[in-house]
A protein has these predicted regions:
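Short beta-strand segments
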Residues: 1-2, 10-13, 40, 65, ...
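Conserved N-terminal subdomain of the carbohydrate kinase-like
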Residues: 1-35, 53
Length: 198
């Protein structure tokens, strides 16, 4: 962590890289239409693609946090309900450098053109841009003095999926996720639900 509470992440995949199609099949036995599957890219891409395809076929909403940043096969996007890249990941997915607000909007449109209905591009202290069913809008970040940025994105994605699973619309869930992510910045740990509510 640097003097501005920004972190650098090093991934030692270990057991994550052993997750395979049989593991996915076991997990999907427990899921049903309307459930939410949240994934990232610290498991084999082949497993991500398989899980997305199978879950989509079952009516499960698949949310992909494309971290760590890498290019992805275009066919994956049509099996996703939503993709939630940060600025760097969004640039990697599209090849478009984000220099201003108009670029963020353009990148969100580009990602949707790949086949996914919903995109949330997280922008740190600038909040996030949501593109939902062809309409874009922004959610401001809650202003805090960061202590540790570790897991802010994970917290955002987890809270977002909790909100959606509890029946919130995407905007409501994103506001809750933004609040949770902001709270995660002011402690050296992720926020608990009671802390989020208070």
């Amino acid at each position: 962590m640097d003097d501005h509470a920004e972190n650098s992440i090093v991934v030692a995949s270990g057991a994550n890289m052993l997750l395979n199609e049989q593991d996915v099949d076991k997990m999907l036995e427990e899921m049903c239409e309307g459930d939410i599957l949240l994934m990232q890219l610290e498991i084999p891409l082949q497993t991500v693609e398989y899980a997305a395809r199978k879950a989509f076929g079952k009516g499960v909403k698949v949310v992909l946090n494309p971290a760590p940043a890498r290019s992805l096969p275009k066919e994956l996007f049509r099996h996703l309900y939503m993709v939630t890249p940060n600025r760097i990941e969004a640039e990697m997915l599209t090849g478009i450098k984000i220099a201003n607000d108009a670029d963020v909007e353009k990148v969100a449109e580009e990602i949707c053109a790949m086949g996914v209905k919903n995109v949330i591009i997280t922008l740190g202290s600038k909040g996030c841009l949501i593109r939902e069913e062809g309409v874009s809008y922004r959610i401001d970040a809650f202003k805090v003095e960061p202590v540790d940025t570790t897991a802010a994105g994970d917290t955002f994605n987890g809270a977002l999926c909790v909100g959606l699973s509890e029946g919130m619309d995407l905007k409501q869930a994103a506001v809750m996720a933004s609040k949770a992510s902001s709270l995660s910045l002011i402690h050296i740990s992720e926020p608990t639900r009671p802390r989020l509510i208070s």
